[in-house]
């Protein structure tokens, strides 16, 4: 089995773990609704991004329920 020759110091251990930190999420408040959302993402309540409507509401216009 592989066994280290020397003990790893606390400093070396902490330097190795310095990249394990969690990144902070960039959350902003929506200008229209005041809800929190991720920046550079579509507002899911209205389907808007940068003031433009990008997600349309899918309303089923057919009243066929396939009940035969």
Curated annotation (Swiss-Prot):
Matching InterPro entries: Ribosomal_bL32 (IPR002677), Ribosomal_bL32_bact (IPR044957), Ribosomal_zn-bd (IPR011332)
GO molecular function: structural constituent of ribosome
The keyword Ribonucleoprotein appears for this protein: yes
Keyword annotations: Ribonucleoprotein, Ribosomal protein
GO CC field: large ribosomal subunit
GO BP terms, alphabetized: translation
SUPFAM superfamilies in alphabetical order: Zn-binding ribosomal proteins (SSF57829)
Pfam families per the UniProt record, alphabetical: Ribosomal_L32p
PANTHER family for the chain: 50S RIBOSOMAL PROTEIN L32, LARGE RIBOSOMAL SUBUNIT PROTEIN BL32
Family to which this protein belongs: Belongs to the bacterial ribosomal protein bL32 family.
Protein name (record): Large ribosomal subunit protein bL32
Natural source organism: Orientia tsutsugamushi (strain Ikeda) (Rickettsia tsutsugamushi)
